[in-house]
Amino acid sequence: ADKNFLRF
């Protein structure tokens, strides 16, 4: 999983 995806 992308770290940026965790932002949502």
Curated annotation (Swiss-Prot):
Compartments, record wording: Secreted
Coiled-coil spans in chain: none
Keyword Ribosomal protein: no
Main subcellular location: secreted
Cellular component terms per the entry's GO annotation: extracellular region
GO BP of this protein: neuropeptide signaling pathway
Keyword Secreted attached: yes
Protein name: FMRFamide-like neuropeptide FLP2
UniProt source species: Macrobrachium rosenbergii (Giant fresh water prawn)
